[in-house]
């Protein structure tokens, strides 16, 4: 069951409106491709969740605030009384994880995921919900290689989604 649909970000809508009207700089073109790929990855995840629609409640593209902190949640699924927070990445290429951090990236998606999980848990507790929250980075693009990945990392690859929610 879908409770909130996904919409294009304001940034993506702006890029699409300008595309063809102006020539993007290299940096603008890179950012446009990044934002577009992210949205496409989120839509692909939505399609996968829709195939499980009878067992899943979906909330997409949420902006949450609690205790002066905010987070953007790509997808929140409720399955059998458990809440799954998914941060969706449509990355392509090779990446390495060492000691819980992505090598060579300035921002750490695992830290972002933990922060989002804390905010979701706080909001649920504040409104009287006592449910377990499981947070996962979902790498939706099959053209990704993750080196150094351990079972302790809260990471799902595309082929693991269906069995994970089993």
Regions found by a protein language model. Name each.
Residues 78-98:
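Active-site beta-strand-loop-beta-strand hairpin of nuclease catalytic cores
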Residues 1-71, 80-82, 102-166:
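Surface-exposed interaction regions that form or flank ligand-binding interfaces
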